[in-house]
């Protein structure tokens, strides 16, 4: 009877915690959801959170309060990595733009700059039709 070798078994690797003092907060605020990703200067993700992941479903995802809760969640995880200052880059026209920045500031993270990097088309794709209610 063959013996199972224990030396080839999968080992559990210890997660290495990076110590990063400053980073970039990417806020993607669409009309339906808000996604916050906090990265280091090289663009490696440290933490992320969404309004939907924070427990909001349906139309409540697209509220400023849902974006605030998501930003607090992402900010707390990023602070475990030693984040002290953030550069905020906001993309999109959604309602969670301002409240997510305020939530990060309220956590005690210093915000060095806020940049709006919303892509503006040079007359590219046709926009969606206007809503009639």
UniProtKB/Swiss-Prot annotation:
Keywords: Ribonucleoprotein, Ribosomal protein, RNA-binding, rRNA-binding
Any one GO cellular component localisation term in the record: ribonucleoprotein complex
Superkingdom field: Bacteria
Record bears the keyword Ribosomal protein: yes
Subunit structure: Part of the 30S ribosomal subunit. Interacts with proteins S7 and S18. Binds to IF-3.
Family matches, as PANTHER family: 40S RIBOSOMAL PROTEIN S14/30S RIBOSOMAL PROTEIN S11
Family: Belongs to the universal ribosomal protein uS11 family.
Name used for this protein in its record: Small ribosomal subunit protein uS11
Species, as recorded: Bordetella avium (strain 197N)
Gene name of the encoded protein: rpsK
């Amino acid at each position: 009877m063959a013996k199972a070798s224990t030396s080839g078994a999968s080992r559990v690797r210890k997660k290495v915690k990076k110590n990063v003092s400053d980073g970039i907060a990417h806020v993607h605020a669409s009309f339906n959801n808000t996604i916050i990703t906090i990265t280091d200067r090289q663009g490696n993700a440290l933490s992320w959170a969404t309004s939907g992941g924070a427990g909001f479903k349906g139309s409540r995802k697209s509220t400023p309060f849902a974006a605030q809760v998501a930003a607090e969640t992402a900010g707390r995880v990023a602070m475990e990595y030693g984040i002290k200052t953030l550069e905020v880059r906001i993309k999109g026209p959604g309602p969670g733009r301002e409240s997510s920045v305020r939530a990060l500031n309220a956590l005690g993270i210093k915000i060095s700059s806020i940049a709006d990097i919303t892509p503006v088309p040079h007359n590219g794709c046709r926009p969606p039709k206007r809503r009639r209610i």
